[in-house]
Amino acid sequence: MVIKVFVATSSGSIAIRKKQQEVVGFLEANKIDFKELDIAGDEDNRKWMRENVPGEKKPQNGIPLPPQIFNEEQYCGDFDSFFSAKEENIIYSFLGLAPPPGSKVTKSEEASSLPNGDVAGEAEGAAEGTEKAEKSGENEAQKEDSEDTGELSESQEKKEEEGEDGEEGEEGEEREEGGEGETTGETEEAPEEGAGGEAEEEEPEEEAGEGEDS
């Protein structure tokens, strides 16, 4: 099978010439056999290209612009399709060719063609999401534990402060009671001293009475 690339060598459009050079240069660099067909100097080539490009790939005026790529009689695509296939590393599938053995393109195409590739990717994504959720849950639990311990330590400090205040209040009351006891003791001793003085005054009066009797 031979790849056919329809180009316009005498095109006045710089954009078209750049696209043609990119396609041809890529095929040459990757040693892909192809045949370059000029539609500018060969009316048969131009007619064949226009007739074999699918209708959905033709512009509104019905005249497809080069470069157009075919694999023998089968249409491969235009430059935009070629560029997308090159970026996705599926250029050999785009051209309808078997990739050379051991090439990077072969591995990427095999991976993209696996039926369970999407499922495996989804499973890996789900596993990663589960691990992240578990880690976030552990972090939240640790935060809650630290908050609980902080509240307990605060409550313990408050209790200790209240206990200290209570002890100080009791000591103050004991001191006040001791002061009251001292004052009451002094008042009780004062009447006793007064009574003793009165008794001493009565004794001289009695002695005076005895003198008069004698």
UniProtKB/Swiss-Prot annotation:
GO molecular-function terms, A-Z: SH3 domain binding
Biased composition (Basic and acidic residues): 129-144
Annotated stretches, region: Disordered: 101-214
Any one Pfam family match given in the protein's UniProt record, by short name: SH3BGR
Motif segment (SH3-binding): 61-67
SUPFAM superfamilies per UniProt: Thioredoxin-like
Comp. bias (Acidic residues): 162-192, 198-214
Alphabetized InterPro entries for the sequence: Glut_rich_SH3-bd (IPR006993), SH3BGR (IPR051033), Thioredoxin-like_sf (IPR036249)
CDD domains given in the database record: GRX_SH3BGR (cd03030)
Keywords recorded for this protein, A-Z: SH3-binding
Family, as annotated: Belongs to the SH3BGR family.
Protein name stated in the entry: SH3 domain-binding glutamic acid-rich protein
Taxonomic source organism: Mus musculus (Mouse)
